[in-house]
Structure formats: structure tokens, C-alpha cells
């Protein structure tokens, strides 16, 4: 390939020692491209009508040439998107990438937009779980004092979830990915303003190499791994991430035994239902994401990354275990012992963010004592 076409990448100096954990940004970009492409082809054949939506999905998978490929790539691609973004955030927490405040805050905004987009998309097939998940989650708006009921009616476009709701959810699901593209551009521009951090958390200005070919090949390897996994799941277990309830058409008269959102929202849903109060649960749900914004302002350690901070490492891996446990608990019915497990893990989840500054001070003291 001619050298001049790669000039843009060659002009981008990147830290020599960034590891595989730094590859997930480019993988997220690939996921976004895949979702917009497959989503466009699905939108060509989808009908946003409560009587026809479910049938149009069946039509896409059965009658449209390669429609099943597009539909499966889109639904499994969403799961891949969230796997990558959660790893991307975990890396940011571990290596304290959040100290680059603008990049971190734009990233959290991106996460919130992505979650909204995925939620709207989950409603579109108009299956049982789509309908009831939409009913339960949008109903949380009624917990807002004074404005709640008006806001919910405004969002629904009526007094219940019906045709206007599906139409506006489709419109929002179509437009929000372009907002994500814009925010991604902002995120990348802000990142290259200062440059990536690295596993040591040190200034790497004196030790940088061109992005291409060194890091671009490393990115390509992980990208190949992700695409292979995506196609393996699509070929051998296409319904791996789907809920069996969603294979039945939405019926407002029959409530599923256990209403739950897609797996990537289960941690937030688990926190929501662990609080036996509607407003309290809604606030906890919002805070489960919003609390990430506090990280740049509560960092007290003199050492940037957790590579050299064993106490923080312990808390970090506790957070990961907590995240997985909440996700698992949220798949279970609301009965003992799952209620208690959900409440304990929710407390543990928030305690990571609250004890982080205290741990930083403790580690600083320990380092001062040893020097």
C-alpha cells in the first residue's frame, strides 16, 4: 500500500507499551459501523406498526435474501458492542484513564446514548419481552415528582404503550446512532488532544511510535478475533443472547412470569429492583451509570494506574465480580435468597466508588512510610 495513504496514521504517535486492553476503542468503532450498516438494511424491510412489526421481523428472517444474516448480526452485534464497551470502561477504571477528564465524560455520555439506543431497539420486534420491558422501564418516569405522569404520557404518545410509542421508538433508534457517531468524533478528537495513557501511567512523550503499522496490526488481530466470534455465534448459536419470551408476539393481556431486559442491562436492572421503593430504585438505576462521572474528581492516589496498587486492585476485581453477580441475580425471580444477594451486591457496587478516594489516601500513606 502506498505510504502517502497512511500518512494520517503515521502522523499519530502512540505510546510504545500500550497493551491489548487499548484495542477495544477501535473494536467499538467496528461494532458501530456494523450496527449502522445492518440496521439500515433491516430498516428497509421493517414496519413500525403494532400489528405488523412482529410479522415484519419474521418476513426479514424468512423471505428477504440474507435477511437472517442481517438480523442475527444486528442482535449479536449489539451484545458484542456492550462486551467491548464494558471492557473498555473497566480498562479506563484500572489504568485511571479517567484522569483525562474530557475524554472520560464524553465517553460516559456515549455510554448513556448507546444504552438508550439499545433499549429502543429491543422494543422494535414487538415480542412479549419487548413490550413488557418497555412498559416497566418507561413506567419508571412516573416516579419523578410532579412531572412523572405527564412525561410518561408524552413519551408513550397516549395513555398506554401503543402504535405512537413504537413509531417514535423506531425514529429514535434510527437517529441516535448518528448522534453516537458525532459523539465518537468528539471523543476521539479529545483523546488525541492529549494522547492515550499507558499501563505504567507515566508520561510517554519521549517513547512513542507511529500508529501504523505497529498498533494498526495489533488492532486488526483483535478485530479478526471479534468478527470470528461474532460469525461463530451467528452460525452455531444465533439465539444465545435472545429471550425465549420474545419469540411470542406482544400481548398486553398476558404478563410474562419474569420481566427482564437484555443481559447487558441486567446489572442496572438488578440494582433497580434491589430497592423496594420506586423513586429510590429509579435514582439507583441512574446513579449506577452516572457515578462513573465522579471518578476523575475522587482520584486521590499519587500513582496513576492500579498496576502498582494492590489494595485498589482487590477492590477493582471485587467490582468486576459484583457486576457479574448482579447480572446473574437479575435473571432470577424476586424471591429469597436472590433479594438479599441483589441488595448486598448493589451495596458492594457503589462502595467501590465511595472507598476509592480512601484507598488512594491509604496507599499514599503506605508509600510515604516505606520511602
Curated annotation (Swiss-Prot):
Domain of life of the native organism: Eukaryota
Membrane topology category: Multi-pass membrane protein
Q: Which GO terms describe its cellular component?
A: mitochondrial inner membrane; respiratory chain complex III
Write out the entry's keywords from A to Z. Answer: Electron transport, Heme, Iron, Membrane, Metal-binding, Mitochondrion, Mitochondrion inner membrane, Respiratory chain, Transmembrane, Transmembrane helix, Transport, Ubiquinone
* A GO molecular function held by the record: ubiquinol-cytochrome-c reductase activity
Cofactor(s) the protein requires to work: heme b
Which parts of the chain span the membrane according to its record? 24-44, 68-89, 104-124, 169-189, 217-237, 279-299, 311-331, 338-357
Q: Which residues form a coiled coil?
A: none
Q: How is the cofactor bound?
A: Binds 2 heme b groups non-covalently.
Where in the sequence is the signal peptide annotated?
none
Q: Where does this polypeptide localize?
A: Mitochondrion inner membrane
Asked if Ubl conjugation is a keyword of the record, the answer is: no
Q: What is its main location?
A: mitochondrion
Residues recorded as binding heme b b566, renumbered to this chain, are 88, 187
The UniProt annotation places a ubiquinone binding at: 192
Record: residues binding heme b b562? 74, 173
Q: List the InterPro entries hit by this protein, alphabetically.
A: Cyt_b/b6_C, Cyt_b/b6_C_sf, Cyt_b/b6_N, Cytb/b6-like_sf, Cytochrome_b, Cytochrome_b_C_euk/bac, Cytochrome_b_N_euk/bac, Di-haem_cyt_TM
Biological process annotations from GO: mitochondrial electron transport, ubiquinol to cytochrome c
The reply on keyword Chloroplast is no
Q: What family does the database annotate?
A: Belongs to the cytochrome b family.
| Other notes | Heme 1 (or BL or b562) is low-potential and absorbs at about 562 nm, and heme 2 (or BH or b566) is high-potential and absorbs at about 566 nm.
Subunit and interaction comment: The cytochrome bc1 complex contains 3 respiratory subunits (MT-CYB, CYC1 and UQCRFS1), 2 core proteins (UQCRC1 and UQCRC2) and probably 6 low-molecular weight proteins.
Known role: Component of the ubiquinol-cytochrome c reductase complex (complex III or cytochrome b-c1 complex) that is part of the mitochondrial respiratory chain. The b-c1 complex mediates electron transfer from ubiquinol to cytochrome c. Contributes to the generation of a proton gradient across the mitochondrial membrane that is then used for ATP synthesis.
Please identify the protein, giving its name as recorded: Cytochrome b
This chain's source organism reads Homoroselaps lacteus (Spotted harlequin snake)
